[in-house]
């Protein structure tokens, strides 16, 4: 599970970019809840500190909006942009969305698609401008509000991000991803109790939401309640058994409660599942060191 919420972080990840598509497909994410584009790389931790993986901000809805406008040529270029997003050619996708907007400046879907694609490549200022352009056309669009919140959070404007997520929740109180996103942002402001409340709400609304349980586990660890955190990590792991980051955090939580054999087992699974990339090297090294410690005779 990547560190961060849009999509994925979140959500984000999206490093990994999760692009949720209204077409019903889910291509790989390049942000999220690892460090997402536009985020600073995590600072080194003391050798005896358990690594903590940051939450992922997710998108409220699908990352690419189906065109609803009638201009056939603008729609064609928007569709091409969506196709290039699927292909992973974000530069060409951006060109197509811009072409659509040259043909039809008030094309809401193209503004929103362009905004999210710019955010995926780390062009936060340009992305925010496009989100705001989309909202001028459709001020009540909740997806645009949520995704603007994600962009603002990644830019460090936590207050602005919270305002956007709360706008979503005023109109749609049952939005699980908006609760997760708000929780992540509140945690970033130091409001751990507020974050816990949002994660618990998300988990109660959607018991099978992996990010809600994972984020709740992380917050409970920070709150000093490892037993409850372990329960949340186990729930998340049941939903996604091959998620390396869940196993890493579960292993560290188990080690912290003296469950050495179980902790070692989870860390071995993490090392088996995690990709050996520069972004993951820090976590891999710390997991290897912790596993050696756990395997030493008492």
What are the roles of these predicted feature ranges?
Residues 54-59, 87-99, 109, 120-133, ...:
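Structural signature of tandem alpha-helical TPR/SEL1-like repeats
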Residues 75-86, 109-120, 143-154, 177-188, ...:
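Conserved alpha-helical positions within TPR/SEL1-like repeat arrays
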Residues 214-276:
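Ankyrin-repeat and related helical/solenoid repeat scaffolds used for protein-protein interactions
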